[in-house]
A protein has these predicted regions:
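Bacterial N-terminal signal peptides that target proteins for export
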Residues: 1-6
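Hydrophobic h-region of N-terminal signal peptides that target proteins for export
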Residues: 8-19
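Short hydrophobic/aromatic-rich motifs at helix boundaries and adjacent loops
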Residues: 9, 25, 60-64
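Cleaved targeting-peptide boundary
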Residues: 19-29
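Conserved "boundary/linchpin" sites in short secondary-structure elements
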Residues: 36-43, 56-75, 89-129
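Short, small/polar residue-rich loop motifs at catalytic or cofactor-binding pockets
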Residues: 46-51
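An anionic, turn-rich surface loop/hairpin at beta-sheet edges
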Residues: 78-84
Length: 129
């Protein structure tokens, strides 16, 4: 009985921490905020690396499925492209779910978005495919 209670308590604490993390994230009210929210968590190997990722989100700001890297250009050369793609996948995993406003979530839920990142400070939503 004691072990079961301890296991339940640990799981509950984990869910509480995750909910607290989501609440601490800034509210995203515009489409461009999606790109800047993810860019804030991205740590590319070089400052002028470029990545375009294709993804979609739920109303609540969670990624639907696996984000697809559609373009990678590392300033370190082709040998660094895999590490660059991995850094973007890590940012998508670690930075989501984003905290969408109800209005934004309703507008973009399920829509495919291409997000272009140029270094850690420039990010834009490009025309959907």
């Amino acid at each position: 009985m004691g072990r079961r209670f301890a296991a339940v308590a640990i799981v509950a604490l984990g869910f509480g921490a995750r909910a607290q993390d989501a609440a601490a994230r800034p509210l995203v009210t515009r489409v461009h905020g999606i790109a800047t929210g993810i860019a804030a968590c991205w740590h590319p190997p070089h400052d002028d690396d470029q990545v375009t990722v294709r993804t979609s989100f739920t109303r609540e700001g969670a990624v639907i499925g696996e984000p697809r890297i559609v373009f990678v250009q590392s300033s370190g050369g082709r040998a660094d492209d895999a590490a660059l793609a991995d850094s973007m996948k890590a940012a998508m995993r670690d930075c989501t779910p984003l905290h969408f406003s109800a209005r934004l979530g309703s507008a973009i839920a399920g829509q495919v978005l291409d997000i272009r990142f140029i270094g850690p400070t420039r990010a834009t939503i490009v025309a959907p495919p």
